[in-house]
Amino acid sequence: MEETLMHNFQPIIGIEVHVVINSKTKMFSPSANSHRSDPNINVHPIDLGLPGTMPEPNGFVVKKALVLAKALNMQNVDHHLRFDRKNYFYQDLPKGYQITQQHHPIATNGYLDISNKRVPIQRFHIEEDTAKQLNEDNHILLDYNRAGSPLIEIVTDPVFDSGKEVKEYLTNLRRILIFNDISDAKLEEGSMRVDVNVSIRPMGAPNYGTRVEIKNINSINNVEKAINFEISRQQELLLSNKKVVQATMRYDDQLNQTVFMREKTNAIDYRYMFEPNIIGINLDQQFLSEVDQIQVFNIKELESKLLSEGVDQQFVELLLDNFFLYQKINEINQRINDLAFVSKWLLIEFMGRINKQKLQLELINPKWFDNLTDLLVLVKSEDLNQKQAKVVLDEIIKTDETVAEIVDRLKMKQIKDEQEIIALLEPIVLENLAILKDYDQRKERVEKLLIGLLMKKTNGQANPNVSIKVLTDLIQKHR
């Protein structure tokens, strides 16, 4: 059935993404830009549009927008900053209009590559957020902490034809936003919000089908699921000779389906007008030079670098999804100089223990990362073997001791001096001369037996590589 549907219809999908910028203050007021505060604490008269207030654009946000323009390959960047009023009345917008950039977006005509196509980005513009609205016990609760928060809205051409493509685009976009410190891009907290427009048309038809908008999706995985469900829903309607109604839907992750919110009728006339309280601002050369000095991370280049260093693909994906871990792996690697080795220890052994204890990564003891680095130095230098290192790592998370203190307490310091190992191993060889006659036929078995006796004698502290070398010499000496 699904194969037949896909042959008969072409999905057309466009994406609009709103991201809250990592700024200490709001877009046009000095009020704190924080969604974690108690409700209605971070509210300024400018946010409410009280008489006599004058909005002042946040220069930090403008810089972040220009960094994003580089990261998204925007061909046209407007250095003459202008704003418009979007007029409408709703309870989440106390002043009756939103300051945005309808007619003069700061950047147009860019792109972001995914695996099978180049996604054209029509535009992105700066605007202010509205209040957060909560429905509770037949009441509408409003939190104006969010009103006036700085937003960037990013709009693509409708070039996607599957939920899988959209998921890849959003994953890549989110990485760009996080690595370049533009936004923390947390869908579950609302700092990245995705609106999806989905329509289908018979294969080869010239006109688009009726568009349905899906809002309030709380994860990238759910975006993919919502799109796939909506495509199937619209296909089934058309095959049943029913019409697709232009509507706004939401995604219910319990039902795993889109749910009707409201019907869309004619486009609202927002009566856009030039924002009279903010004159056009020319971005001067000094301002632009400061932006040019900001490092812009290219995610594809980072991915290629990690892979070329031997980091497994699964680890690369984890690192590109978590800037904190990416920073930590590079900090640790400054002393280790082996990214593949560090990634396995950080992401499997260390993070395995962190996740098991359900600890919040950003809040764990910074000393643990220093201790992990010291531990890996010992492993690389073969002063500890892998088994010993895992025991030490357990102790790092349990205690406040340094690695040196833990190793000393557990008597794990490896014996690497050849003369010391000769003194320990030669008596073992002399006590077991009878088995040396089998050495040529069963070399591995004989070596394993004698090294095992040495490890038992030293509680595993004899260095394996040095021990094998010494054993080979002793066998030749006493055969």
From Swiss-Prot:
Annotated EC: 6.3.5.-
Swiss-Prot/TrEMBL catalytic activity: L-glutamyl-tRNA(Gln) + L-glutamine + ATP + H2O = L-glutaminyl-tRNA(Gln) + L-glutamate + ADP + phosphate + H(+); L-aspartyl-tRNA(Asn) + L-glutamine + ATP + H2O = L-asparaginyl-tRNA(Asn) + L-glutamate + ADP + phosphate + 2 H(+)
GO MF annotation, one: glutaminyl-tRNA synthase (glutamine-hydrolyzing) activity
Protein's recorded name: Aspartyl/glutamyl-tRNA(Asn/Gln) amidotransferase subunit B
PROSITE patterns the record matches: GATB
Keywords: ATP-binding, Ligase, Nucleotide-binding, Protein biosynthesis
Matches recorded under Gene3D superfamilies: 1.10.10.410
Leader sequence segment: none
Domain of life: Bacteria
Keyword Ligase: yes
Function noted in UniProt: Allows the formation of correctly charged Asn-tRNA(Asn) or Gln-tRNA(Gln) through the transamidation of misacylated Asp-tRNA(Asn) or Glu-tRNA(Gln) in organisms which lack either or both of asparaginyl-tRNA or glutaminyl-tRNA synthetases. The reaction takes place in the presence of glutamine and ATP through an activated phospho-Asp-tRNA(Asn) or phospho-Glu-tRNA(Gln).
InterPro entries for the chain: Asn/Gln-tRNA_amidoTrfase_suB/E (IPR017959), Asn/Gln-tRNA_Trfase_suB/E_cat (IPR006075), Asn/Gln_amidotransferase (IPR018027), Asn/Gln_tRNA_amidoTrase-B-like (IPR003789), GatB (IPR004413), GatB_Yqey_C_2 (IPR023168), Gln-tRNA_amidoTrfase_suB_CS (IPR017958), Gln_synth/guanido_kin_cat_dom (IPR014746)
Subunit structure: Heterotrimer of A, B and C subunits.
HAMAP family: GatB (MF_00121)
Family under the similarity heading: Belongs to the GatB/GatE family. GatB subfamily.
UniProt key word Glycoprotein: no
GO biological processes: glutaminyl-tRNAGln biosynthesis via transamidation; translation
UniProt-listed Pfam families: GatB_N, GatB_Yqey
